[in-house]
């Protein structure tokens, strides 16, 4: 990724070719249609609801983007949360967004910062690989899996095993866009909205 980023910065790699690489690493471009940014020029500071946080007047608005961070079944450790919080403060707007697929997202990320950000995530066992693009998206599970009184068994180990198996698997690199998988630990219940996924597994 870092090599392709350097080639892209040197105008030696087509933007469309690089886009496929960055999407597979969870790096999105962001566009603003409300006057906040146009062609890389800030016309006013971005304001956040119920907060005084902005990116600040000294930010170089060179098309900041979004970094999606893959968290299988939403399982995260205290150490990982500390690192995620630090990255939100250092590279983003101080806000760590939680997604409906149990991922995290950092907005207003500069593409030049993404290699260091990815290295720091990797140091605590987190990846952004295949968080976007034509791959299997984050494997989700019941939000209270492992502690639910009604579950048949804890499905989180199965969610993690499938995530590990599919990550980088050659047969899962050119799926249809947003191929999604979820696990439910409750027999006869569509917890984690498994009935709305491409593959939904229900414990029995």
Segments the model singles out, each with a brief description of its role:
Residues 1-52, 191-194:
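Charge-rich, low-complexity segments
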């Amino acid at each position: 990724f870092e090599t392709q980023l350097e080639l892209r910065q040197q105008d030696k790699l087509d933007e469309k070719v690089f886009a496929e690489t960055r999407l597979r690493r969870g790096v999105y471009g962001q566009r603003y249609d409300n006057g906040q940014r146009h062609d890389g020029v800030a016309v006013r500071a971005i304001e956040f609801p119920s907060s005084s946080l902005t990116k600040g007047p000294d930010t170089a608005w060179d098309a900041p983007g979004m970094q999606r961070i893959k968290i299988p079944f939403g399982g995260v450790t205290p150490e990982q949360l500390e690192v995620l919080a630090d990255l939100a403060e250092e590279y983003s707007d101080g806000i760590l967004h939680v997604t409906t697929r149990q991922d995290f997202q950092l907005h207003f990320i500069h593409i030049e910062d993404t290699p260091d950000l990815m290295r720091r995530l990797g140091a605590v066992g987190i990846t952004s690989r295949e968080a976007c693009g034509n791959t299997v998206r984050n494997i989700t599970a019941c939000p209270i899996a492992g502690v639910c009184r009604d579950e048949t068994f804890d499905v989180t180990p199965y969610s993690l095993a499938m995530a590990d198996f599919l990550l980088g698997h050659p047969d899962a690199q050119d799926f249809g866009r947003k191929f999604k998988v979820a696990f439910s630990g409750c027999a006869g219940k569509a917890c984690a909205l498994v009935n709305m996924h491409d593959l939904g597994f229900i414990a029995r």
